[in-house]
Amino acid sequence: MRKPYRKVVVGGTFDRLHLGHKALLRKAFEVGRYVYVGLTSDEMIRNKPYAEKILPYELRLMDLLKFFEVNGYTNYRIIKINTAIGFADRIKSLEAIVVSEETYKGALLVNRAREERGLKPLEIVTIKLVKSRIGPKISSTLIRAGLIDPFGNPLKKDN
C-alpha cells in the first residue's frame, strides 16, 4: 500500500504507553513513509496531572523503542522536545501531523508557527479517541491515578 505522505510528525509524552498512544503511532506509520516523533522532556511535563508519577524520559523512550521494534517500524526518528511546537516548525519537508481529536488544536498551533516561519502548513490527520471502560477515553492521567490499566480496563480497588 502506498503511503500518502513522505514525512509525518507525531508528538506526546507517551507515558505508560497505552492503546490510545499505540493507535496514534500506528496511524502515523500507516500514513507516513518516515515518522518524526516528538517526545516531551522531563522539564516539559512538570505541570501535568500526577507529574510525580510520570515515567522519566529515558524509560518513556525505551517503551517507544520497544513498541517500534515489536511492530517492525524502522523508518522513524525520535527527538526530545521542550515546547508544544517542538521541531515541527523547523523541518521544511514535513507534510502531515497526526493527532487525536483531543489534540487537534495543537496541530493548528503547529501550523500557525510554520506559517510564521514561511513554511507550508501540515495536513492534519486525526484519529478518534480510544474509549476506556469507565470513561470517554484511555488516558495516561487515569492510569497514573490508578483508575484504569493501559488497555482501558478499570482497576479493582482493595476493600
Swiss-Prot record:
Biological pathway: Cofactor biosynthesis; coenzyme A biosynthesis
Gene3D superfamilies xrefs: HUPs (3.40.50.620)
Sequence intervals crossing the membrane: none
Entry annotated with the keyword Flavoprotein: no
Gene Ontology molecular function, alphabetical: ATP binding; dephospho-CoA kinase activity; pantetheine-phosphate adenylyltransferase activity
Enzyme superclass (EC): transferase
Swiss-Prot/TrEMBL GO biological process terms: coenzyme A biosynthetic process
Residues in the signal sequence: none
GO cellular component: cytoplasm
Subcellular locations according to the entry: Cytoplasm
Family that this chain belongs to: Belongs to the eukaryotic CoaD family.
Role of this protein: Reversibly transfers an adenylyl group from ATP to 4'-phosphopantetheine, yielding dephospho-CoA (dPCoA) and pyrophosphate.
Name assigned to this protein: Phosphopantetheine adenylyltransferase
Organism of provenance: Thermococcus gammatolerans (strain DSM 15229 / JCM 11827 / EJ3)
Upper classification of the organism: Archaea, Methanobacteriati, Methanobacteriota, Thermococci, Thermococcales
